[in-house]
């Protein structure tokens, strides 16, 4: 009976309530109830709008809660799936926003010039250097950028074989340059550039409207566009519905019916405004905005930019509803001869990074590269970027392995013999050398020859005794003045005997041929000759050597030893008087700590001079 009563209650949920509570099997009462009565029918939702909710016997939650009660334990799972779907849609929106911002930033001519200069620098790196550079740049990415790159890299892995990505045959033609420039461009999203890209971070509700055609963006970033399309396809396959979006954007889709006005005029109101008012429309043709722009080349394959003097123009302060104008101040159309020389290098001589001071090897073949790759603006921008990493104002960026020059001391015994006769200079007919002094000024041929002549005449100019007999005894060394190694800044460094090639020759000179007599036969250490230091004193010193038999000097043993350049033995001999010191012999000096044989011989010679002076009565 209890079960029957329960069934009766369940079956009576959608009927009018019974007046009595006794359990019975008879059907529910079919009393006539007016249409305006609140108890007309429980399933009639019109009764919920009645003005007197206090007359209701069943609460409103009995109606609203039935769908949730019927789901049971599947409710939590459905909520989690909804959250995952919403997050997926948000990620796709973020990818599209990122791609649109990248495309808008790439259209900036100044940024394109800077990126082209970076690509030229990147082209001369080895594989290991490219990997290290990309790894260092990826350390600056945000979490949004990391997720974006993961999708793009996965798409790149599907489209390109591994061998083609790791070792491209030609950097200019390989699609890898597009992907690398994408990475370079994406790192500037969170920078402090004063552009409209900051509006998407500050106010998410005011999305930017680039007005770019989706096919244009796809052509500029093919892998990124393909990755986003793949994500959309996955979402549609999983959920059965295409991803909906509330983005006010027209990138990669045509959901722009409710979007705010973009840069391109609408189709129906095209004739309302003046023709050509938009920077993206080249004329009044009705198909210009809808037609894909074929002039937009992919990233990494930029055409020659307009000569704009290499200067950035101030960016306008734009509100969320204003159109984005191109703000590059282009110079008037002039011939190349009228343009200012922004670079000291010839514009048709090839890669800017190769025009370094390398007398040992010639630079890149100028005929192999086109003039479009070395335009004036790219050279100027590249020089500004490279100025941060120069040494002595010399550009030393081109050090690729296949162009790396041999070291000056790696020559085999039959190659590059030392010249033994007068030579005016090193003849390099194929070398394209540009000399730059420490002030960054380009030197002419006459100035370079004058510097070489000065170096030839002043071979011993840094020595205290230019007429030292040691150099005159070696006629072969006197003709090496015009030759300087690349390590000496290419004919611009003052002559120094510390050059590796000359130091080897100086070490082989017999000291007896120097014509040194008396106490000058001893040098306190070997580095004095290697450094080109005169035995009588420091370089550049005009003070004559002091007389070791000076009575005043003999009273001060430390000063006397210093005049003989034997001050390292002051602690061993300072407690003795000069009269006792000159009586020491070789064995006694060795016992005193004078271990060097040359020092002992020099002391004994000076002792003999002092004894002779004492015998002559000079010392009293």
UniProtKB/Swiss-Prot annotation:
Query: Region Disordered: which residues?
Result: 1-82, 190-216, 258-321, 404-425, 517-554
Q: What GO terms are given for molecular function?
A: mRNA binding; nucleotide binding
The record, for Gene3D superfamilies, names: Transcription Factor, Ets-1
**SUPFAM superfamilies listed in its UniProt record:** SAM/Pointed domain
What are the GO BP annotations of this UniProt entry?
nuclear-transcribed mRNA poly(A) tail shortening; protein transport
Q: Does the keyword Transport apply?
A: yes
- Please state what the protein is called: RNA-binding protein VTS1
The record lists the organism as Gibberella zeae (strain ATCC MYA-4620 / CBS 123657 / FGSC 9075 / NRRL 31084 / PH-1)
Supply the source organism's classification.
Answer: Eukaryota, Fungi, Dikarya, Ascomycota, Pezizomycotina
């Amino acid at each position: 009976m209890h079960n029957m009563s329960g069934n009766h209650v369940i079956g009576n949920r959608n009927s009018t309530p019974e007046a009595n509570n006794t359990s019975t099997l008879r059907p529910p009462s079919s009393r006539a109830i007016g249409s305006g009565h609140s108890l007309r029918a429980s399933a009639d939702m019109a009764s919920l709008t009645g003005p007197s909710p206090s007359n209701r016997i069943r609460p409103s939650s009995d109606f609203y809660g039935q769908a949730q009660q019927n789901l049971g334990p599947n409710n939590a799972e459905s909520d989690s799936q909804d959250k995952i779907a919403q997050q997926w849609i948000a990620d796709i929106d973020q990818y599209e926003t990122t791609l649109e911002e990248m495309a808008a930033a790439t259209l900036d001519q100044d940024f394109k010039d800077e990126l082209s200069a970076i690509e030229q620098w990147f082209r001369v790196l080895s594989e290991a250097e490219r990997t290290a550079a990309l790894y260092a740049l990826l350390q600056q990415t945000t979490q949004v950028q990391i997720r974006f790159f993961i999708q793009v890299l996965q798409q790149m892995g599907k489209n390109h074989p591994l061998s083609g990505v790791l070792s491209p045959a030609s950097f200019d033609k390989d699609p890898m340059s597009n992907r690398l420039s994408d990475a370079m461009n994406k790192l500037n999203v969170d920078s402090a550039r004063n552009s409209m890209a900051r509006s998407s971070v500050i106010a998410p509700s005011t999305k930017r409207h680039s007005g770019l055609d989706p096919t244009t963006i796809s052509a500029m970033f093919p892998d990124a566009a393909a990755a986003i399309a793949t994500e959309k396809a996955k979402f549609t396959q999983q959920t059965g519905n295409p991803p909906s979006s509330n983005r006010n954007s027209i990138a990669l889709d045509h959901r722009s019916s409710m979007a705010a006005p973009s840069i391109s005029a609408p189709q129906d109101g095209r004739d309302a405004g003046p023709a050509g008012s938009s920077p993206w429309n080249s004329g009044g043709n009705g198909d210009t905005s809808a037609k894909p722009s074929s002039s937009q080349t992919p990233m990494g394959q930029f055409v020659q930019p307009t000569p704009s003097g290499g200067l950035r123009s101030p960016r306008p302060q734009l509100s969320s509803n204003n159109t984005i104008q191109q703000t590059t101040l282009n110079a008037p159309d002039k011939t190349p001869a009228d343009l200012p020389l922004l670079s000291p290098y010839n514009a048709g001589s090839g890669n800017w990074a190769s025009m370094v001071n390398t007398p040992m090897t010639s630079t890149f073949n100028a005929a192999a590269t086109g003039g479009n790759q070395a335009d004036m603006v790219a050279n100027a921008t590249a020089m500004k970027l490279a100025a941060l990493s120069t040494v002595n104002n010399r550009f030393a960026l081109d050090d690729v392995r296949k162009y790396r020059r041999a070291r000056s001391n790696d020559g085999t015994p039959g190659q590059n013999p030392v010249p033994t006769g007068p030579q005016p200079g090193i003849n390099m007919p194929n070398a394209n050398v540009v000399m730059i002094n420490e002030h960054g000024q380009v030197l002419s041929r006459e100035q370079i020859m004058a510097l070489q002549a000065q170096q030839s005449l002043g071979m011993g100019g840094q020595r205290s005794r230019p007429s030292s007999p040691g150099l005159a005894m070696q006629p072969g060394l006197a003709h090496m003045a015009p030759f300087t190694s690349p390590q000496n800044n290419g004919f611009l460094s003052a002559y120094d005997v510390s050059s590796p090639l000359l130091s080897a020759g100086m070490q082989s000179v017999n000291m007896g041929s120097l014509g040194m007599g008396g106490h000058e036969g001893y040098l306190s250490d070997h580095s004095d000759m290697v450094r080109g230091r005169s035995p009588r004193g420091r370089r550049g010193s005009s003070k004559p050597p002091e007389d070791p038999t000076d009575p005043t000097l003999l009273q001060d043993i430390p000063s006397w030893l210093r005049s003989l350049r034997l001050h390292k033995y002051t602690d061993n001999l300072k407690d003795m008087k000069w009269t006792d010191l000159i009586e020491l012999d070789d064995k006694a000096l060795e016992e005193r700590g004078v271990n060097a044989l040359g020092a002992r011989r020099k002391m004994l010679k000076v002792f003999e001079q002092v004894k002779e002076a004492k015998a002559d009565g000079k010392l009293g």
